[in-house]
């Protein structure tokens, strides 16, 4: 089973993912899973080097170059992490996947859905998530959070508010137009423990997820 988590930078998803996995392991000690993320991947030096380039605030790329870097990193990640884990019947939890690409590059960078979908179809093939949790919180609130917590901003996080507004609106459009009904919208303004409980309770009742519980 392939589960992804999406949302703006500062939405709290990475913190929630880590707490969620702790709770799952506490309750289901033999749960077999892989935790990974994009851009980059789990211990994959090639895609991690691309990640460093993409997020380096000292480097500049055209939107198309950036999109090609993301796509290359994604294919490496699929080949070396996602597909092998799924072949071993493990659950894959992934912090960001191609929905981020659509939102950030398609909408944020104004490359459009046709262009980003073409690249995604080439890179991804049939490796589509079974379930995606979207952390819903406004760009204004995420900026406020990052400022209050003195978080270091990478190259994308340094973009102005209009960029992040486009990304947010892009996510909403992607969810609205999704034909696979795989999205679960999470209120990311709630406390971390409430979000963790919500996702945990959703998963343990999900018909595909329960097959992995021991």
Curated annotation (Swiss-Prot):
One of its GO terms (biological process) is dTTP biosynthetic process. It is an enzyme of class 2 (transferase). One of its GO terms (cellular component) is cytosol. Its EC number is 2.7.4.9. It comes from the Bacteria. It catalyses: dTMP + ATP = dTDP + ADP. GO terms for molecular function: ATP binding; dTMP kinase activity. Keywords: ATP-binding, Kinase, Nucleotide biosynthesis, Nucleotide-binding, Transferase. ATP binds at residues 7-14. The keyword ATP-binding applies. InterPro entries: P-loop_NTPase, Thymidylate_kin-like_dom, Thymidylate_kinase. PANTHER family: THYMIDYLATE KINASE, UMP-CMP KINASE 2, MITOCHONDRIAL. HAMAP family: Thymidylate_kinase. Phosphorylation of dTMP to form dTDP in both de novo and salvage pathways of dTTP synthesis. Belongs to the thymidylate kinase family. This is Thymidylate kinase.
């Amino acid at each position: 089973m392939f589960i992804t988590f999406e949302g703006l930078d500062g939405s709290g998803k990475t913190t929630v993912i880590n707490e969620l996995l702790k709770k799952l392991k506490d309750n289901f000690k033999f749960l077999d899973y892989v935790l990974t993320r994009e851009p980059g991947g789990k211990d994959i030096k090639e895609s991690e080097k691309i990640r460093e380039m993409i997020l380096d605030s000292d480097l500049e790329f055209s939107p198309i170059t950036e999109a090609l870097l993301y796509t290359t990193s994604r294919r490496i990640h699929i080949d070396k992490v996602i597909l092998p884990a799924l072949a071993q019947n493990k659950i894959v939890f992934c912090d960001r996947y191609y929905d981020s690409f659509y939102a950030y590059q398609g909408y944020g960078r104004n490359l459009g859905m046709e262009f980003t979908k073409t690249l995604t179809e080439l890179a991804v093939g049939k490796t589509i998530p079974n379930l995606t949790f979207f952390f819903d919180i406004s760009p204004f609130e995420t900026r406020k959070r990052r400022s209050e917590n003195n978080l270091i901003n990478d190259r994308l996080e340094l973009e102005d508010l209009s960029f992040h507004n486009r990304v947010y609106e892009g996510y909403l459009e992607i969810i609205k137009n999704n034909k696979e009904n795989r999205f679960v919208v999470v209120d990311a303004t709630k406390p971390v423990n409430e979000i963790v409980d919500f996702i945990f309770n959703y998963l343990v009742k999900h018909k595909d997820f329960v097959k992995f519980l021991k």
